[in-house]
Amino acid sequence: METHLQNGKNKTVIKSNPKEVHQDLGGNTFLCHLKDMVNPGGKGFRVGRRERFFIIRKDNKVLGYINICPHQGTPLDWKDDVFLTFKKDYILCATHGAVFEIETGECVGGPCLGRILVPIKLKVENGKIMLAC
C-alpha cells in the first residue's frame, strides 16, 4: 500500500510505504517549509484519495486539523489553501459559514457551535513543518 501526500496547489506527491516513512523519518513526514507559508495563512494536503487535512500558520505557531466540518462532514475550503476568513482571524467552513478558533478548532459561530475540528499532530524543526506520529 502506498501513501500519497498531495499539496493542493503544487500537486506534489510523496509515495512510500507507511512503515518505511516511519522508519526513515523517525515517524515524521515533511509537509513544507515554515517560510513558504503565508502568515497568517493555510495550506491543504491529502493522504491517499480520502484523508484531507490542513495546516494554519499564525505567527510562529503552526496548527493542523482534519479537513472535515463537524456540521455536515464537508471540506472546509472552497478554494485550494483558503481556510481563513477574510480578516484571517478564524477558520471558515465555506459550505455553511461556521467559524472556528484557530488555536483550538472550536466552533464559535454557525451551525455546529461548540463542536471542534479534529486536530492533527505537527512539529516544526529547523524551519520544516512535519506530521508527527
Task: Give residue spans per PLM region.
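N-terminal pre-ligand scaffold of iron-sulfur
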Residues: 1-84, 102, 116-133
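Short linear sequence motifs
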Residues: 46-47, 89, 93
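Short cysteine clusters
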Residues: 69, 93-96
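Short metal-binding segments enriched for Cys and/or His
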Residues: 99-106
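Short cysteine/histidine-rich metal-coordination sites, predominantly Zn2+-binding motifs
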Residues: 83-91, 107-115
